[in-house]
Amino acid sequence: MRHKIKSRKLNVTSSHRQAMLANMAVALVTHEQIKTTLPKAKELRPYIETLITKAKKADLMVRRSVLSKIKDKTAVEKLINILGIRYKDRPGGYTRIIKAGFRYGDLAPIAYIEFVDRDINAKGNIQQDANEEIKN
């Protein structure tokens, strides 16, 4: 029976999964949009949303708690100083997942995960990325 099992295994060990989620969270905070597989995006969403909810308080205890999760000082600074202020009035739902088809090699479902109200200059436009993939 699958009682009280919340997360996906993603076919990796637990330490690998935690490191992968932390690295993906740093990439998402830095670029505000990343392209990954759909199960990884679905696992990243609650992980990053709890970090943003904590970052809205912006005190020393929160800074240390977030730094213990993602281990990148510049990402923590952006999370607390920019994203925490940006989503101060939003009660949740800071990210969206956009399905983007299937990967060519193994037909894995691909998705973009991005922040709602994101800074477009931080990464790029999804439509431009899709047009570049079609050209290549």
UniProtKB/Swiss-Prot annotation:
GO molecular function: structural constituent of ribosome
Mitochondrion listed as a keyword: no
One Pfam family, short name: Ribosomal_L17
GO biological process entries: translation
GO cellular component: cytosolic large ribosomal subunit
Organism domain of life: Bacteria
InterPro entries noted in UniProt: Ribosomal_bL17, Ribosomal_bL17_CS, Ribosomal_bL17_sf
Keywords, in A-Z order: Ribonucleoprotein, Ribosomal protein
Family: Belongs to the bacterial ribosomal protein bL17 family.
Complex and partners: Part of the 50S ribosomal subunit. Contacts protein L32.
PANTHER family: LARGE RIBOSOMAL SUBUNIT PROTEIN BL17M (PTHR14413:SF16), RIBOSOMAL PROTEIN L17 (PTHR14413)
Protein name: Large ribosomal subunit protein bL17
Species per Swiss-Prot/TrEMBL record: Rickettsia africae (strain ESF-5)
Taxonomic lineage from the root: Bacteria, Pseudomonadati, Pseudomonadota, Alphaproteobacteria, Rickettsiales
Annotated gene: rplQ
